[in-house]
């Protein structure tokens, strides 16, 4: 079974958490694209979605699913999103698709965060296989970069990428994130940082892992 098939298994299993006549929060990325495709098969069951990226919005509309603005929704029953890495405590690194800030906003609206991944995304320590994305106000890029170096990281400017919010991304290598909650707070306190890709203060409630043996649910 290849990686795409495992992503589809996880995405399909997440449909079990979608209840009738609700608005669903949807993240972004390749695994979420599989979920959007699956959600299209039950689109008449739900009111619509709040999407965390313009790319996801576009795919949802192609499926004929109504997209709501986050400002018009007071809460969501569930938020479904992928991860670049996830640890046993259900904390994540996200932001490979540069949508981390909007993902945090929509996740904060949700009563339950369901993370869908294939088994390659599971790690013991965050930062093991994937650099940490940090969204930065453009004028602060160099200043933030120096601060990240002082903290032991090796930031790399993600050239040619502008976020949906008009900002830039620094991908920070060499971080072994042993205390994700404290690291998330510390980085978010750096002047010029919009947010960073550690999702520890608001981690996942349920993890659905696509494996060669089927979808494994961790709750």
From Swiss-Prot:
Position of the signal peptide: none
EC number, UniProt record: 5.3.1.6
Pfam families: Rib_5-P_isom_A (PF06026)
Pathway: Carbohydrate degradation; pentose phosphate pathway; D-ribose 5-phosphate from D-ribulose 5-phosphate (non-oxidative stage): step 1/1
Catalytic residue list: 103
Entry's Gene Ontology BP terms: D-ribose metabolic process; pentose-phosphate shunt, non-oxidative branch
MF terms (GO), sorted A to Z: ribose-5-phosphate isomerase activity
Residue sites binding substrate per the record: 28-31, 81-84, 94-97, 121
InterPro entries per UniProt: NagB/RpiA_transferase-like, Ribose5P_isomerase_typA_subgr, Ribose5P_isomerase_type_A
Entry function: Catalyzes the reversible conversion of ribose-5-phosphate to ribulose 5-phosphate.
Assembly and interaction partners: Homodimer.
Protein name: Ribose-5-phosphate isomerase A
Species annotation: Haemophilus influenzae (strain 86-028NP)
């Amino acid at each position: 079974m290849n990686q795409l098939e495992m992503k589809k298994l996880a995405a399909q299993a997440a449909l079990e958490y979608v209840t009738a006549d609700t608005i669903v929060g949807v993240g972004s990325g390749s695994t979420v694209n599989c979920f959007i495709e699956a959600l299209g098969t039950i689109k008449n069951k739900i009111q619509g979605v709040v999407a965390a990226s313009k790319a996801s919005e576009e795919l949802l509309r192609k499926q004929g699913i109504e997209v709501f603005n986050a400002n018009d929704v007071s809460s969501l029953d569930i938020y479904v999103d992928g991860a670049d890495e996830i640890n046993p405590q259900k904390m994540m690194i996200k932001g490979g698709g540069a949508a981390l800030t909007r993902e945090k906003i929509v996740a904060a609206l949700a009563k339950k965060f369901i993370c869908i991944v294939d088994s390659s995304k599971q790690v013991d320590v965050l930062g093991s296989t994937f650099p940490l994305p940090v969204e930065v106000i453009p004028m602060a890029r160099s200043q933030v970069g120096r601060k990240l170096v002082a903290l032991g990281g090796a930031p790399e400017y993600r050239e040619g990428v502008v976020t949906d919010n008009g900002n830039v991304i620094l991908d920070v290598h060499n971080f072994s994130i042993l205390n994700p909650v404290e690291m998330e707070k510390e980085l978010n306190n750096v002047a010029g940082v919009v947010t960073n890709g550690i999702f520890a203060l608001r981690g996942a409630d349920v993890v659905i892992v696509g494996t060669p043996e089927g979808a494994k649910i961790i709750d």
